[in-house]
């Protein structure tokens, strides 16, 4: 067994990206051992949320001071302090989970729209989007499926609860949901695109149509306008 990774010395707000980096070293089903911050630094429930976002199941089993983290197939969150906007997909596709970049399948128009809107300046580079532009990325549900219609409504409800805790902890001012299904399933079945009256924790909520190429009713200029509006707050 390799030596555990000691995550106690990093700042609490840097923990999501540290866990994401650790996640990228493991294949699904593999385990990693980490020495995690004490409960008075990061609450256990929040720590479980952050582990889930990074693609780890947080196990109770400990080896000395280390906790075993088991990797599952998903796309790790790209989140951290100072975000101005959190972009939230429905859930990862197998391609996104395996390639490590969301919205990157051929025909998906998220990145072309994000570039055209001035939201990001590098194509398919979520790390740069976070560090250079304050744009984070996550998903409502972290379970990977081939189609979003394979998800259950309860998964959206549980996923939004995780997001509430995260956006309040990181003080995210606004969240943009790419795809309407998650918000409709968990909060407002009649919700349309645009800014919502209801917030997600303390964050304002913007809904926009799916950027998938299967969504023929939304053109690239329309998607660009939605992202520009979400970024403008």
List each model region and its residues.
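Short, surface-exposed acidic-centric catalytic microdomains
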Residues: 4, 99-154
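Short N-terminal binding/cap micro-motifs at the start of the first secondary-structure element
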Residues: 94-98
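C-terminal capping/extension of enzyme domains
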Residues: 43-45, 50-81, 106, 113, ...
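An N-terminal amphipathic alpha-helical segment
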Residues: 1-33
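Short, well-ordered beta-to-alpha junction loops that form the rim of enzyme active sites
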Residues: 37-39, 90, 177-182
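Short, hydrophobic/glycine-enriched beta-strand segments
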Residues: 79-90
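Short, conserved loop/helix-junction motifs that constitute active-site signature segments
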Residues: 25, 167-170, 198-201
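Internal catalytic-core helix/loop-beta-alpha segment
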Residues: 134-189
């Amino acid at each position: 067994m390799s030596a555990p990774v000691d995550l106690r010395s990093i700042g609490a707000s840097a923990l999501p990206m540290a866990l994401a980096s650790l996640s990228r070293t493991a294949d699904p089903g593999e385990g990693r051992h980490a020495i995690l911050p004490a409960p008075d630094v990061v609450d256990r429930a929040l720590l479980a949320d952050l582990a889930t976002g990074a693609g780890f199941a947080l196990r109770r089993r400990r080896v000395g001071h280390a906790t075993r983290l088991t990797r599952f197939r998903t796309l790790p969150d790209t989140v951290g302090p100072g975000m101005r906007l959190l972009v939230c997909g429905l859930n990862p596709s197998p391609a996104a989970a395996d390639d490590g970049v969301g919205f990157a399948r051929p025909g998906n128009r998220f990145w072309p729209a994000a570039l055209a809107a001035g939201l990001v300046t590098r194509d398919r580079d979520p790390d740069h989007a976070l560090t250079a532009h304050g744009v984070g990325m996550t998903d409502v549900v972290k379970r990977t499926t081939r189609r979003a219609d394979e998800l259950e409504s309860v998964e959206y409800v549980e996923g939004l609860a995780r997001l509430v805790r995260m956006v309040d902890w990181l003080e995210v001012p606004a969240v943009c949901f790419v795809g309407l299904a998650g918000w409709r399933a968990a909060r407002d079945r009649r919700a349309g695109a645009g800014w919502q009256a209801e917030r997600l924790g303390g964050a304002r909520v913007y809904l926009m149509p799916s950027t998938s190429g299967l969504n023929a009713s939304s053109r690239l200029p329309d998607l660009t306008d939605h992202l520009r509006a979400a970024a403008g707050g």
